Amino acid sequence: MLPALPHRNFGLFCMSYSFSSSSRSLGLGLAALLLLALPACRQSGATIESGERRAPDDSTSLRIACPLTAESLPFYYAVRSGICDSLGLPLRVKTYFAQFDADTALLGRTVDGGVTDHYRAAYYRSRGRMRNFDEFIALNGSWSLLAGGRLRIRELRNLKGRTVGMARYANSDHYITRLRDSLRLKSDDLFFAQVNSFKIRHLMLENEQIDCAVLPEPYASRAVANGNVRLSSALPSEMRMSLYMNQRALRNKRHNAQAQLLRKAYNLAVVAINKGRSPYLDSVLVKDYQVPAAQLSAIRLPHYDATH
């Protein structure tokens, strides 16, 4: 009798076999085949892919659209660290640099859920969209208003007449509007430049194409590391984001079970992330979030709360 294989999610191929002494060579051959098949048996099919890539439709996996912000980080960690594989969760994380593009996927039929902010969700619902979605996991993040390092902007009162990169009908829009009103500036005292992509918004700030930018982590920390100035950090309560699940997916027995496994994967991921830097976390930041290795120590991530 071969010893039990060290993982429970192997499918029909990964079974125990018994052999008589007269068929020892055959048994060894089958054992070798089992060992060769072991990596495939262990995989749940969890993947990370570009949202722009047209992947074949896969109704057997749980598909979520994620913008590359700190709020989505636990989902990437759960895939890269093998947490999803250990739970047998075939999670497909579709990656987007702009919230608008992630929302387009969420509102379509190519994913089962996605990450967006509460202002955008309210905006869509006011227009008769996103009414068939449930808030499934409340997420943690961190957002800041940054000013170009070469400009003489060191305080919020220096913002008059400046151009700020943000996105309309989103938490960044709400945040900079609240700051403008608190400074008693007129609507034409501050110029809003709509830049949906977080990556491009960050690059425009670095290249002095805009004076300021509202950026999520890890882009904000990268900007500070490059000499730009953090003028203000938003309160968590005003930049709330969540994973929303389509009710159609939750009514499906398979996807509902996968969604419950996703909660477990998320909780395991946040426990690990909250402990600080690790090879898996560094890998996610470098490979998925495109953080230069030299800036890893400068990244300031939020504390992540477990979901229930």
Regions found by a protein language model. Name each.
Residues 119, 192-193, 197-288:
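Pocket-lining segment of extracytoplasmic ligand-binding domains
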Residues 47-186, 192-194, 204, 211-217, ...:
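Short, glycine-/small- and polar/acidic-enriched structural segments
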Residues 37-40:
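C-terminal motif of bacterial Sec signal peptides marking the signal peptidase cleavage site
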Residues 150-157, 180-182, 188-191, 202, ...:
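Proline/Glycine/Serine-rich low-complexity intrinsically disordered segments
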Residues 5-30:
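Bacterial N-terminal signal peptides that target proteins for export
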Residues 42-45:
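Bacterial signal peptide processing site
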Residues 49-50, 57-62, 73, 212, ...:
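An extracytoplasmic/periplasmic, membrane-proximal ligand-sensing/linker region
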